[in-house]
A protein has these predicted regions:
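A broad detector of short, well-ordered amphipathic alpha-helices
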Residues: 58, 95-98, 142
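Catalytic cysteine-centered active-site loop
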Residues: 43, 68-129
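Extracellular/periplasmic catalytic domains that process cell-envelope and extracellular macromolecules
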Residues: 49-55, 61-62, 125-128, 136-139, ...
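Intrinsically disordered, low-complexity
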Residues: 1-69, 179-182
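Aromatic- and glycine-rich peptidoglycan recognition patches
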Residues: 113-122, 136-141, 147-182
């Protein structure tokens, strides 16, 4: 029964997402960030602390080498893409950033243009590790995680995988977005 299979798959995905959120909360609690109920929340679903930023970067970095797949990625890991990448498991840029931030209990939207609007806008000169870098009008074309020292972590269609790349300024939006305050 296809409906039963779809319902079972949805239930499993929800359980996996909850387990991911619980692990992130447990990790942050062990660092003294937030309580057992979750990380220290700020308005707009943001959390505080340099440890949270480092966890997001470490979680994202653990996916280096995972294939790029347009439309792929979820809060619990890589997933099949859509259109030309249907059947290919991996991340697109926004699915990747969504996965990285879910580890600290922050759910950001799937679409990069919506992610651009979630946090606090920061001038590039004030960028810190963990800020999101966007490209295209309203952040609609690409998103990456700023690492500092002119580097970013991204799921790159050009590289075909999750990778560390030199920061590109061509086409960058006027602001980065800060989700986690340090």
């Amino acid at each position: 029964d296809p409906v039963a299979v779809a319902q079972a798959s949805l239930a499993f995905t929800q359980q996996a997402a909850q387990a991911t959120m619980d692990l992130g909360r447990k990790f942050l609690s062990g660092l003294g960030i937030g309580g057992g109920s979750g990380p220290a929340a700020l308005p707009g679903g943001r959390v505080r602390g340099p440890q949270a930023v480092e966890y997001v970067i470490a979680r994202g970095g653990s996916q280096r080498g995972v294939p790029y797949s347009w439309g792929g990625g979820a809060i619990n890991g890589p997933s099949t893409g859509v259109d030309q990448d249907a059947g290919k498991v991996g991340y697109d840029c926004s699915g990747f950033t969504r996965y990285a931030f879910a580890g600290v209990g922050v759910q950001i939207p799937k679409y990069s243009g919506d992610q651009y609007e979630v946090g606090r806008h920061i001038a590039p000169s004030q960028a810190k590790r963990g800020d999101l870098i966007f490209y295209g009008p309203g952040g609609s074309q690409h998103v990456a995680i700023y690492l500092g020292n002119g580097q970013m972590l991204e799921s790159s269609s050009a590289a075909g995988q999750v990778t560390v790349s030199p920061l590109r300024t061509a086409g960058m939006t006027p602001y980065l977005t800060r989700i986690i305050e340090t």
